[in-house]
Design a protein with these regions (language model features):
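Flexible, acidic glycine-rich loops studded with aromatic residues
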Residues: 1-171
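Short, compositionally stereotyped local motifs that mark structural "simplifiers"
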Residues: 131-238
Length: 238
């Protein structure tokens, strides 16, 4: 709809609920706080949006199963009206915000990703026509950006006013050939693990490299910030 009004000559601001609403949950995990009426929107969904051609976002198109027929029937922005898109806007609604910690969790690092989208020029990968080359370049650039957030930006946030209760996503984990492999959405944060089924705490072992497991080990993972605050844990199935 935004392109319709921009093409009619109106100055418009994009506020896309499927990418720019901070109160949308990113997956079906019941531990997440927020809403899902506009789908599941994670940090990468926000980062990959092409403001001037939303269907040029191949990551979002594929994730949301948007058909070729739908794309062809939808109004596109006339290049001559590009200047009518004067910005983008994020939203955070308070229906599910019951305390300050939930506000922090929805706000940060969402605002970091959104600010990068709002204040940066179009990335080069958006101009790549070859699908394989585009996807590999996109993944490379996204990996750089999320490493920057985890290793440089969030440690600064930890020291502002004693830190914010920003989102600490559950780590990812898999067990292959009796070996544990784990990662996090923002490399640089601390992944703690236990193998006895207990809840990882700040004194638990750090995950730094793949770990060989015993047959009866029960693995739990949990992400921690530099102030010792932990996120929700996850148990890794064998």
């Amino acid at each position: 709809m935004i392109y319709k009004y921009a093409n009619l000559g109106y100055k418009t601001v994009m506020s896309n609920s499927s990418a720019f609403y901070f109160d949308m949950v990113d997956d079906k995990d019941l531990d997440n706080v927020g809403l899902s009426w506009s789908g599941y929107a994670d940090y990468k969904d926000m980062w990959t949006v092409d403001v001037f051609d939303i269907f040029n976002d191949s990551y979002g198109v594929e994730k949301n199963n948007i058909t070729k027929e739908y794309i062809e029937s939808s109004e596109k922005l006339n290049p001559s009206n590009r200047d009518n898109i004067i910005g983008i806007q994020s939203q955070i609604w308070s229906e599910t915000i019951r305390n300050e910690d939930i506000l922090d969790y929805m706000f940060m690092p969402n605002i970091i990703v959104f600010s990068q989208k709002a204040w940066s020029k179009d990335p080069e990968w958006m101009k790549i026509s070859d699908k394989s080359n585009r996807e590999s370049t996109l993944d490379y650039e996204w990996n750089k950006f999320r490493n920057t957030i985890g290793q440089r930006v969030l440690p600064i946030i930890d020291n502002i006013y004693g830190g914010l209760s920003y989102d600490l996503p559950k780590p990812g984990g898999i067990i292959k050939n009796d070996t544990l492999y784990a990662n996090s959405a923002f490399p640089g944060l601390n992944i703690k693990y236990t193998t006895d089924g207990s809840l990882p705490n700040i004194k638990s072992s750090n995950y730094n490299n793949p770990i060989k497991l015993n047959e009866d080990d029960v693995v739990n993972l949990r992400l921690f910030d530099n102030n010792g605050r932990g996120g929700n844990p996850i148990q890794v199935d064998k």
